[in-house]
Every structure is written in C-alpha cells, then in structure tokens.
C-alpha cells in the first residue's frame, strides 16, 4: 500500500521479530511482517510463527527439566525483508540486552545496503518485548500515515521508546530462573512463600525488580500502582497488555489500570511463542 505526500509516493514496511505480537489488523496489513525466532524445548525446535500452538508449548515446557531456549532470526532473514520494495524499511526487535535479534537485524541491514546503498533502513531496539514491540510498530505506522519524513519519524519513534516502560508479573518464574535472566533476584524469590516479584524494564532495556508481594493478586495490585505513578502523558498513549493463557487476569489488570489513569486506546493480546516462553503460564505484561 502506498500513500501520496507532496506529490511523491511513499511506502514502508515494518519487520517485527516474533517476540512482538501482531494484532489481527496488523496481520492483515501486508506492510507488517514477522521474523520468526526458533524455540528449543528438550531438543525439539519449534518455529515461532503462525503454526505456534501455545497450549502444546506450555505442556512441553512444564514437562522438560531443562530451560527452553530461543534463537534469533538470522541476518539473512532480515536482509530478505529489507530487500522488498518500499521507500522506508524498519525493524523492531526484542531488547538488545535480552536477545541477539537487534544485532542480527543490524547485520541484515548492512547486507541489504551493500546491494542497495540508497535504501532507507532503521532498526529500532525496543528495549522492551512482546506488546512493547507491537506498540512501537503501530507508532511507526501512525507517523508514516501522517506523512513524516524518514529522519523525523526515526527521531519521533526513538523518543516514544524512551517514554515507554514495560511492567510484568509472572505466575511461574521457572524459565527466568533456569536461564539466568533473573539471577540478581533469585534470592528474593521464595516459591514456598508464594512470593511474586513485580518486574520492569530499565531505560537500557534490561530487567529489574520493583517490588514483591505474597501471591500473584497482591503483586498485580502493586504493579498497577507503579503503572499509575509513572503514567505521565498517558492520555496520548496506547496501553498494551499481553498475557500467557490468562485472559480474565489480563482483563482485571486492564480495568484496574483504567480506573486510575486515562489512555488513548488499549490493546490486549495473547502471547506468541517467545513471550510465552518468558511469561510462562499465567504471566501478564503491561507496556505504557
């Protein structure tokens, strides 16, 4: 699809790595595409694409004593996306602090530019994950549809990323514990006491612990408190929520947040493969 601005044709494409869930309307919009990560559970490779079966995946993870692993899309996969016809090409990746996807996309950009040096390509390090990537992709489309030039759009979206914070509470901490993502807070997680940490992204895109509570419901209440405290400028922002197999819990979180703050819109999505691996059964992720 192309739009005419000032007499010129402008088209764009956005590649999200598959940690970023796509809404139904994004899936129907051929300007968006997903670059699949590969998940490995007990020696079995599972492609994180439209064939991903969350319930089956969660069963396999629960039954496997080893931590599931993920492998990012190859530079060649990103290069293929960047070689498609479009005036402006973008990728949105999982936080570079958590995955090699960003570096792979940068390499893919460089490969594409060797063949097409005039292409305009930018890689956005989401410094987030899951629905955080979704919101960034939607921001790109909003800016493109408003007719922004490439450099202004990149600056606008990077500032939007700066303003984002990702919050999450997990019912099941096994994956994060096993793969060392939560090494700094291992000592604080006492499963016998049902202590659930309230987690958030750092400005650099790493994971930190904000708080903890006994039981997931109390932890979710604390998470909502932190979101309400940090909600400056929320009237102009979209609230993104993703959940792993717990739609009712996500709805309760959404309603609790909307009782406290005003937002432009809300999207609620079920986690795809990579996010399901980290959120695990019962996890809720909120991005604002």
What kind of region is each of these model predictions?
Residues 69-76, 214-217:
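Conserved phosphate-coordination/catalytic loops
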Residues 3-13, 19-33, 38, 98-101, ...:
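Mixed-charge interfacial surface used for oligomerization/domain docking
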Residues 13-72:
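N-terminal glycine-rich anion-binding loop in soluble enzyme alpha/beta folds
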Residues 93, 120-127:
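A ubiquitous short alpha-helical element
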Residues 73-89, 93-115:
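Active-site cofactor/cluster-binding pocket
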